[in-house]
Amino acid sequence: MAKKDEHLRKPEWLKIKLNTNENYTGLKKLMRENNLHTVCEEAKCPNIHECWAVRRTATFMILGSVCTRACRFCAVKTGLPTELDLQEPERVADSVALMNLKHAVITAVARDDQKDGGAGVFAETVRAIRRKSPFTTIEVLPSDMGGNYDNLKTLMDTRPDILNHNIETVRRLTPRVRARATYDRSLEFLRRAKEMQPDIPTKSSIMIGLGETKEEIIEVMDDLLANNVDIMAIGQYLQPSKKHLKVQKYYHPDEFAELKEIAMQKGFSHCEAGPLVRSSYHADEQVNEASKKRQAQA
């Protein structure tokens, strides 16, 4: 664990091999031309080159690029957001179709300034992608929408392939890590989503390295399973800037492998766990695995 004013040295296993090809450069050019945002870029995701260049998957960030919250782990800009762009859903869908994406993840900044939390634009984005790229699987990754479950229903009625909502950290650290969200509200959000559409897989992820214990990580697993979450992702927290929370521990890949084994033994249909794993990492594979498990249980 890091001492109060100590910065840990980043270990060798966190060095990233950069892959760039026409998929990567084409998608990046398309984003700029269409005034679109991706969480891959805004949140400084370490897997952007693999996802864009190799796997042909991308995570679009809608509802603008400014978040109304200021979570202490997140690199996305915060402040007063711009007005909603009602043409954004069509531009996202056009980009998905043009790039022939296998899997599209749609996330958003938190829009606590909007009565519907942005659910209307979220839902229209899903519908637009369905029209223009019917073979692309769609994962939605909303905020907790302030715990308004009518807004969640608006989104779930579009029947995405996966509903993803991140609990982010263990119960004890939640007030410090994301002060404007609550651990139990995230669990309730996931439970309600499954109740609304029981056949749609649900997913959640946590970052580790913020000072949690192994027992607390396992408690998160149990809490997610108790609320019928199918898929879990576990990744290393990386400090985006000096103003964000410091890394307290860098977990070894072997520790991630052990956590994945525990999660699978407990009953998740899929668990991604590794130093560079993020919420949408290998998301295209998770759709297929969750579908196979549901078919086997039918």
UniProtKB/Swiss-Prot annotation:
The lineage of its organism: Bacteria, Bacillati, Bacillota, Bacilli, Bacillales. It comes from Bacillus velezensis (strain DSM 23117 / BGSC 10A6 / LMG 26770 / FZB42) (Bacillus amyloliquefaciens subsp. plantarum). PROSITE patterns: RADICAL_SAM. One of its GO terms (cellular component) is cytoplasm. InterPro entries: Aldolase_TIM, Elp3/MiaA/NifB-like_rSAM, LIAS_N, Lipoyl_synth, rSAM. Binds 2 [4Fe-4S] clusters per subunit. One cluster is coordinated with 3 cysteines and an exchangeable S-adenosyl-L-methionine. Its cofactor is [4Fe-4S] cluster. [4Fe-4S] cluster 1 binds at residues 40, 45, 51, 280. GO terms for molecular function: 4 iron, 4 sulfur cluster binding; lipoate synthase activity; metal ion binding. This is Lipoyl synthase. The gene is lipA. Its EC number is 2.8.1.8. It is found in: Cytoplasm. The keyword Signal does not apply.
